Structures are given as structure tokens and as C-alpha cells.
Regions:
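ASCE RecA-like P-loop NTPase motor cores
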Residues: 1-387
């Protein structure tokens, strides 16, 4: 349930792209020339928005655009009912359903939404109805039943999730004590290393690589190392390969791995080997949660960085929204989502009462109270170390 915040944001959001209007207009006008005018009205308004937008731009009212979008949707509906067979029907239908979704979602727009435009990296121009606070929409779903129970091992801080998953202020929250003993895990925190953008250089990568190597050589076994991005993972991996010289076996997660490659990657943790296995992975990715490697299959996780989401227009919009309303903009947009990825990655190590292992947090920011206050109770005992 810890993923429900982001998933519900997307579920209750909608977006349109200016370029799609032009592409579909070229198709439809060949079969029904009269509909071209409605496309032109929409495109003209979107063009005005595009000219106003530099990085991204927030709007309070898009009533004029919605008027023409609804007229266009009505004419497209009639066109698709009459024209059941033409080569591009699938493309036109997908555009129509996306347009209908945008119109339907607009009816939900209130103070829990931000309407914004932005220029995409692929040079397309987007307008989005962004559900920054999904609590009201989720509460409507919850109210259809007698009760709802949300469960996750990483609901921290709990108030963050209570605020975003429901509008009610009297919901119960239960912190279940862990079934695992303190002796099963060792928590280490590196105080002389960081994944900050300003610190991402060769010397920092070498220090991180040294941590990884010393951890892997301290006890033979299988380890996962989690990074905040593919780019940094690759940079440290290359440094590690030069530093290690073949003392351990290292594998690395590839972007867009299919099911076959994913299974082959996980199978490495069940294979018998004479050396330590170090698996380089991306935090928040397919190996960062939802995998179950028990006992000797995994005896340690090294987590590089605080998991902060990449800076983007949407993250900046979230930060501005929650800063104005709660004075916690950075926490809600970056710190809390990032810490959840850290907790999920750390949770790969101890899966049963028979597991033992090490969790290593490599970022000096974990020593700050803003982060220590987000630690689970089981992390009260920890050792601070340097390379």
C-alpha cells in the first residue's frame, strides 16, 4: 500500500498533447472535413499556452479550452459511430478515449489538483490535470465499503500516508512490532560519503566502491547495492571493477529488463560460487522491492544515497503545493518518497526469522535528525563508520 500514493495520483490525473491534435486532425479531415474546425480551435488555444510556457506554467482556469475539447469530443463520438471501418480507426479511437478521460477528470478538478503545461524532452507540449493530493478521491472509494485496511512495512512517517490516503483525521494507525530480533541484522552508516549531485565525482565514486568492496570481502556471500540512478550506478560499477580486480563477482541491472532477464538476474543468488556476489541495482526499481531472497541467498544490502526522486517539474509543483499548505514541501515531494525507497531496499535482507545480514547506509545525510526521525524502531541500534 505504500505505492498507493503515487499510483492514485496517476490514476486520477489526465493529460493531453498538442501534437496529437494535429496528427489526428490530418487523419479525420480526410473522412469528415467539417470536424477540422474543432481541431483548429483546440490547437489554437494550446498554441497560446505553448507560447506562454517557458519551463512549466500553472493555470487556475482553462474553461475556454474545455469548451472546445467537449465540442470536439462530441463530434468525434459521432464520427466514430458512423465510421466503423477505416485504416486509422485505432489511432483515432485512442485519441478519443484519452480526450474523454481528460474531460471526465476535469470534473474532479478542485483544490486537490494543479493544472499545468510543460515542454517535454521529446519536444512535445503537454497539459496535465495533476492530482497532487489523492486523499479525497481515495476517500470516495473507501466510503463505498464498511472499512479499509492499508498495510505496508514501510508506512513511515505514518502521518504522511494518513494525510494522503484519506481525508479523515481520526483513522487508527497501528505500528506492529517486528518478529525479528536485533541480533539478526547489523546497521552501518557511512559518515564520510554522499550521493549529493555536487559530490558526484571520481573521488566520491572511489570511496563508495571501497565501501562496497570491504563489505563484500568482510564475509563471503551475496549482496545487493542500490543506487539512486542508472547513471551513478554505472559510474560506480566501472570504478569498482578497476578497484576490485576480480576478487568478487559483480553483476549489474540493465534498463528495461524483460521477465527472462529478470529471472536470470535473480537466479544468480541461488547459484553456488566460491566468491562473493555483488549485484548493482537501482533503488525503487524491479529489484528494490517485491523480491524474496531468503537465508544465504542475500546477506546484505548497501544503499547509496537517500533515494530522493529526480528533480522534475512535477516534483517542483508538489513541493510548492505542500509548502504553501503545510510548510513541508521538500518532505512531501522528495524526502518521504525517497526514504520509502531506502526502507524497501533495506527490507530485502531480513525476510525470515532464520535470516541474518547487514544493512549499510552510505550517505552522511542519514546522520541528520530529519532522516533519523524517519527510521523504523528496529534501527535504534546502529554503528557509524568510515571507509
Amino acid at each position: 500500500a505504500h505505492n498507493l500514493v503515487e499510483r492514485s495520483r496517476e490514476m486520477y490525473s489526465a493529460e493531453i498533447y498538442k501534437e496529437d491534435f494535429l496528427a489526428v486532425k490530418k487523419i479525420v479531415k480526410r473522412y469528415r472535413p467539417g470536424i477540422e474546425q474543432q481541431f483548429n480551435h483546440c490547437n489554437r488555444i494550446l498554441l497560446e499556452y505553448k507560447r506562454e510556457c517557458e519551463k512549466y506554467k500553472v493555470y487556475d482556469n482553462i474553461g475556454n479550452l474545455m469548451f472546445y475539447l467537449m465540442k470536439l469530443a462530441s463530434e468525434l463520438d459521432e464520427f466514430l459511430q458512423r465510421s466503423t471501418e477505416f485504416p486509422e480507426r485505432k489511432e483515432v479511437s485512442e485519441f478519443y478515449f484519452g480526450l474523454r478521460n481528460f474531460i471526465n477528470m476535469y470534473e474532479r478538478v478542485d483544490e486537490h489538483y494543479v493544472i499545468y503545461t510543460e515542454h517535454m524532452e521529446d519536444e512535445r507540449f503537454k497539459m496535465k490535470l495533476y492530482c497532487v493530493d489523492p486523499s479525497l478521491n481515495l476517500q470516495e472509494c473507501i466510503d463505498r465499503g464498511n472499512s479499509a485496511i492499508f498495510f505496508s512495512a514501510t508506512f513511515l512517517p505514518i502521518q504522511y500516508y494518513k494525510n494522503l490516503l484519506s481525508t479523515k483525521k481520526d483513522n487508527y494507525a497501528v505500528y506492529a512490532e517486528t518478529a525479528f530480533s536485533e541480533e539478526q541484522s547489523l546497521l552501518l552508516m557511512g559518515s564520510d560519503v554522499s550521493s549529493r549531485y555536487t559530490r558526484r565525482n571520481q573521488s566520491e565514486f572511489e570511496r563508495i566502491a571501497q565501501y562496497i568492496q570491504k563489505t563484500g570481502l568482510a564475509k563471503k556471500g551475496n549482496y545487493m547495492v542500490f543506487f539512486p540512478s542508472y547513471k551513478m550506478m554505472q559510474q560506480v560499477y566501472e570504478v569498482f571493477q578497476e578497484l576490485d580486480g576480480g576478487n568478487v563477482e559483480a553483476i549489474i541491472q540493465e534498463p528495461g529488463m524483460n521477465e527472462e532477464k529478470r529471472e536470470a538476474f535473480l537466479a544468480e543468488f541461488s547459484a553456488e560460487r566460491e566468491k562473493t556476489l555483488i549485484a548493482f541495482c537501482v533503488m525503487g526499481g524491479i529489484f528494490g522491492e517485491g523480491i524474496d531472497l531468503k537465508k544465504e541467498q542475500l546477506i546484505g544490502a548497501v544503499i547509496v544515497g537517500t533515494g530522493l526522486p529526480q528533480i522534475s517539474n512535477e516534483r517542483e509543483i508538489l513541493m510548492d503545493y505542500y509548502e504553501k499548505r503545510m510548510g513541508e514541501g521538500f518532505d512531501y515531494a522528495y524526502r518521504y518518497p525517497g526514504m520509502n525507497k531506502v526502507l524497501q531496499a533495506a527490507g530485502r535482507v531480513i525476510r525470515t526469522i532464520d535470516d541474518v545480514g547487514v544493512i549499510e547506509l552510505l550517505d552522511e545525510r542519514f546522520l541528520q535528525s530529519d532522516y533519523r526521525n524517519l527510521f523504523p524502531k528496529e534501527w535504534e541500534k546502529r554503528l557509524v563508520c568510515t571507509v
